Amino acid sequence: MDIFQVIVLALIQGLTEFLPISSSAHLILPAQLLGWQDQGLTFDVAVNTGSLLAVVIYFRRELFSMFTAWTSSLVTRQQTQESKLAWWIILATIPAVIFGFTAKDFISTHLRNIEVIATTTIVFGLLLWWADKLNREGFSEFQVGWKKALLIGFAQAMALIPGTSRSGATITAALALGLSREAAARFSFLMSVPVSLGAAILVVKDLLSSQEAIDYQALVLGTALSFVAAYLCIHYFLKIISRMGMTPFVIYRLALGAILCVVIFA
């Protein structure tokens, strides 16, 4: 990989990981237009690590409070709002784990193509618009409850289909279930931690068993750029949605879907 490819793909991964616009749709366009080959497991580890570090550092206080409350609840059997939130996020992670292990090969073989990505980009963009218009004041992430957490978890599992967008699917489900925009985004971002950590472990496992040469320059640069892009993305996304809602991202998804359709039929 040359430096330009590393910069472009790392920034795309960092920016699109937490915006409801689908990272796979953005990663496929440079590959299609510029003829780039697959970036390899080493680079996947780098950009996933950068994104994971960004959300952990940005929400470090919340995650620390949740972790200490959760571990305390295991001993005392008494629940606080932080420990409940931790349990709900654990519950919401289960569907993605099950679906990921059972459908991984099918998705990679049959659904990882530009036609599917174009369709899901448009369809889930329209669903995001519907959920955002349906939403009013909403409630906070501390009022989710186990039923809603599980439903949002199923949405996260569905996001394994390329083009859906993990944050897009979970935010859409959270809005439809009554969370406020900011709470939906925060819950989605917190949900990403166990999923991203698990995915990173699996990728590292695959990397250790492969014969792929490690490009340390791409590793360091990809991690750093992905971290910075993801951190800034989280910060400004939470500010934008409080004022403008999801409409800009819906319009962007529809435009991107249209571009992908042009690429398909060109």
From Swiss-Prot:
EC number: 3.6.1.27
A Pfam family the protein falls into: BacA
Top-level taxon: Bacteria
Subcellular localization, as worded in the UniProt entry: Cell inner membrane
Entry keyword set: Antibiotic resistance, Cell inner membrane, Cell membrane, Cell shape, Cell wall biogenesis/degradation, Hydrolase, Membrane, Peptidoglycan synthesis, Transmembrane, Transmembrane helix
Xref: InterPro entries: UppP
Top class in the EC scheme: hydrolase
Catalytic activity: di-trans,octa-cis-undecaprenyl diphosphate + H2O = di-trans,octa-cis-undecaprenyl phosphate + phosphate + H(+)
HAMAP family in the cross-refs: Undec_diphosphatase
Sequence similarity: Belongs to the UppP family.
Record function comment: Catalyzes the dephosphorylation of undecaprenyl diphosphate (UPP). Confers resistance to bacitracin.
Protein name as catalogued: Undecaprenyl-diphosphatase
Taxonomic path: Bacteria, Pseudomonadati, Pseudomonadota, Gammaproteobacteria, Alteromonadales
